[in-house]
């Protein structure tokens, strides 16, 4: 009983203690639970933060890996493997352009291959360009009658046939990317840049893709888009390089290929065009810009959304205010552009009013290398090799033999470097410009003559103290007595030619003017000269076209009319015949008929001079007749001309003179000129305003025996000493 009571008391005591202190116990429990909850919350938060950091690090690593992967793929992706530059050149211009372009492309880090079309077989190789990822550039010139240069003939022939051969298929060159730059002269209007246009068209017909519009370089400085063919090429080259940079970056907006004529016109503005906006702004002054505003167009499958254009024409009400704002902004920009356009049109009109200079930097460089001293913007003077020869007492030119000029006192010049022909035998290297009328800036005749004499005298002064130069002839050479207007070009094209001639005669300088028989009206209006030449390079229409390569479509009628105009002249007139073996030596009867038209006082017959190998001409030494052949031709021609005889010979120049019998006075030839008498007659003509006329027989002089045909000297002046060169290289230039 006591034990159970004690146990109960013990339990009761403790329970009562707990009951009495229950508030303390609750507080401790609450504090403990709070501490546990707080610690658990803190631990959970830290764990979450750690997981977030880990996940973020993993995400960054994943993104970095993805970025590296994309970069690696991009680096491995090749958009342009290289550039192949094809050139077809006759005179070397397009070849030179090809090398210039290659240098610029190399700077972009791309491999470049220069390909002469003559050495390339398109049948075996061209199809490879459809998968090569190369850009093929074609620089090709247009030659005579719209034909390609000899080096590009086979390539063009194959390409034309392939584009029209169903066996190749219309997608034969699909995937090939190309650009074309054509070289031509707009003076030849019917054939201007024909070859470049055809190559572009034929490639397009075979589904090749243009990377930019076809461009055209113009040798005619008057109509050239940028003033010269060199400037045209430079402008195109800048555009091409910008286009190439865009292609390198992976742009996929080539020309759609739907522009059949090679003149791409974008309907929508692509992102690549921003690369070229600066160049296009610079060229808004050009008269051709309206036909070639863009260098390429967007592909046909491009979506409107790519250019920021909505797919629907509807506008939400919420966007109406923004739309109105954009419309006002567009109107302001349009008004601003309109004013700018008017200003540019005014500047363009002003530019059109100001003619361009004939001499371009490239022409200046070429002629200077050939020994020309250029005057102003269209004239030049050069020291003839016969002038140098006679200063040394080594003999004069054929004019000295035939007409008695003093070769060391003869100035060879021209007031017009331009010509209306591109003769195959021209020894001026075909560097001079061509044209059918005067459209360049014009210098005054007083300035031209003053500068011509000054430059001629300066060139003579360079011979002071040179071994072999005769002192008396050196002093005489400083005083110009004769002027050969036969240097280069067509002097009669110069609008102030009559004024120039009067200035010459006022200074007692005789005038020997040469024309190419393409300007009959100018011949009729020409004032008297000491001697007027007409080049008669062929006697039939076909051979004249082949040899002279004239610009005029009616060249033959102009030729005939020029000869008829020559017959009306009262002063000394000369036919100049240049014999080219296998070209024009078998046309004796036709030559005789031409003599009957012009009734010249004299006929000079000269064998063509071989000027060395030239890309502009296919003449060789085989085309140069021997002197004996020239003599035989002259004798056979005289047999058909009852009023003419062979008068003089200059063996050194491979030249013969046929003279009208009226110059054989009292049995003696009088082909020489009394220069003092001519000056008296021309002064009287001028003072009388043309009423006191005179004829060729009024200023003749006796021809010395050594100058006559059949003499022992064969036209070499015995007062001089014949000089034989040790080597065969010689200067072939001369009047």
UniProtKB/Swiss-Prot annotation:
Pathway: tRNA modification; wybutosine-tRNA(Phe) biosynthesis. It catalyses: N(1)-methylguanosine(37) in tRNA(Phe) + pyruvate + S-adenosyl-L-methionine = 4-demethylwyosine(37) in tRNA(Phe) + 5'-deoxyadenosine + L-methionine + CO2 + H2O. Residues 403-649 form the Radical SAM core domain. Residues 345-356 have a biased composition (Basic and acidic residues). Its EC number is 4.1.3.44. Keywords: 4Fe-4S, Iron, Iron-sulfur, Lyase, Metal-binding, Nucleotide-binding, S-adenosyl-L-methionine, tRNA processing. Residues 258-269 have a biased composition (Basic residues). This is S-adenosyl-L-methionine-dependent tRNA 4-demethylwyosine synthase TYW1. It comes from Xenopus laevis.
């Amino acid at each position: 009983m006591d034990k159970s009571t004690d146990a109960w008391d013990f339990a009761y005591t403790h329970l009562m203690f707990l009951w009495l202190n229950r508030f303390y116990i609750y507080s401790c429990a609450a504090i403990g639970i709070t501490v546990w909850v707080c610690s658990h919350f803190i631990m959970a938060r830290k764990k979450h933060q750690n997981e977030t950091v880990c996940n973020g690090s993993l995400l960054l690593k994943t993104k970095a890996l993805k970025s590296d992967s994309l970069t690696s793929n991009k680096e491995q992706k090749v958009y342009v493997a290289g550039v192949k530059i094809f050139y077809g050149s006759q005179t070397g211009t397009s070849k030179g352009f090809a090398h210039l372009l290659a240098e610029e492309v190399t700077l972009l880090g791309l491999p470049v291959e220069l390909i002469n079309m003559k050495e390339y077989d398109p049948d075996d190789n061209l199809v490879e360009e459809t998968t090569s990822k190369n850009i093929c550039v074609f620089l090709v010139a247009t030659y005579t009658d719209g034909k390609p240069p000899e080096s590009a003939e086979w390539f063009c022939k194959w390409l034309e046939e392939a584009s029209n051969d169903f066996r190749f298929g219309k997608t034969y060159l699909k995937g090939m990317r190309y650009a074309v730059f054509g070289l031509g002269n707009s003076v030849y209007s019917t054939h201007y840049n024909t070859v470049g246009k055809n190559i572009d068209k034929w490639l397009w017909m075979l589904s090749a893709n243009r990377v930019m519009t076809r461009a055209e370089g113009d040798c005619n400085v008057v109509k050239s888009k940028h003033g010269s063919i060199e400037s045209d090429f430079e402008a195109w080259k800048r555009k091409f390089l910008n286009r190439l940079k865009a292609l390198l970056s992976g742009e996929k907006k080539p020309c759609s290929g739907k522009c059949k004529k090679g003149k791409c016109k974008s309907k929508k503005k692509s992102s690549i065009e921003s690369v070229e906006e600066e160049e296009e702004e610079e060229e808004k002054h050009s008269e051709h810009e309206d036909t070639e505003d863009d260098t390429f167009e967007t592909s046909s499958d491009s979506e409107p959304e790519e250019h920021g254009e909505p797919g629907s024409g509807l506008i939400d009400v919420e966007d109406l205010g923004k739309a109105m704002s954009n419309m006002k902004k567009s109107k302001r920009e349009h008004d601003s552009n309109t004013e700018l356009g008017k200003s540019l049109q005014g500047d363009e009109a002003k530019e059109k009013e100001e003619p361009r200079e004939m001499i371009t930097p490239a022409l200046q460089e070429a002629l200077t290398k050939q020994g020309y001293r250029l005057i102003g913007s269209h004239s030049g003077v050069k020291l003839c090799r016969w002038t140098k020869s006679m200063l040394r007492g080594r003999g004069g030119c054929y004019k000295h033999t035939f007409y008695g000029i003093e070769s060391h006192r003869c100035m060879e010049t021209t007031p017009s470097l331009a010509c209306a022909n591109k003769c195959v035998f021209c020894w001026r290297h075909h560097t001079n410009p061509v044209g059918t009328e005067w459209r360049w800036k014009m210098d005054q005749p007083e300035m031209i003559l003053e500068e011509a004499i000054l430059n001629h005298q300066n060139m003579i002064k360079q011979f002071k103290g040179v071994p072999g130069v005769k002192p008396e002839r050196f002093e005489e050479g400083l005083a110009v007595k004769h002027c050969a207007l036969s240097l280069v070009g067509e002097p009669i094209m110069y609008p102030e030619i009559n004024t120039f001639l009067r200035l010459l005669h006022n200074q007692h300088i005789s005038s020997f003017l040469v024309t190419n028989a393409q300007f009959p009206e100018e011949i009729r209006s020409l004032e008297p000269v000491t001697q007027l030449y007409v080049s008669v390079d062929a006697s039939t229409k076909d051979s004249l076209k082949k040899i002279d390569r004239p610009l005029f479509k009616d060249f033959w009628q102009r030729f005939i009319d020029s000869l008829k105009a020559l017959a009306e002249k009262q002063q000394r007139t000369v036919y100049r015949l240049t014999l080219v073996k296998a070209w024009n030596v078998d046309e004796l009867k036709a030559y005789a008929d031409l003599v009957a038209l012009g009734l010249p006082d004299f006929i000079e017959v000269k064998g063509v001079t071989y000027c060395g190998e030239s890309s502009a001409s296919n003449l060789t030494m085989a085309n140069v007749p021997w002197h004996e052949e020239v003599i035989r031709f002259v004798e056979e021609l005289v047999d058909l001309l009852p009023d003419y005889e062979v008068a003089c010979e200059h063996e050194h120049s491979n030249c013969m003179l046929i003279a009208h019998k009226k110059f054989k006075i009292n049995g003696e030839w009088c082909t020489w000129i009394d220069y003092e008498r001519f000056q008296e007659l021309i002064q009287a003509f001028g003072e009388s305003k043309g009423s006191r006329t005179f004829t060729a027989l009024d200023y003749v002089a006796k021809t010395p025996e050594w100058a006559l045909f059949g003499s022992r000297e064969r036209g070499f002046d015995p007062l001089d000493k014949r000089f034989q060169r040790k080597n065969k290289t010689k200067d072939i230039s001369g009047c």
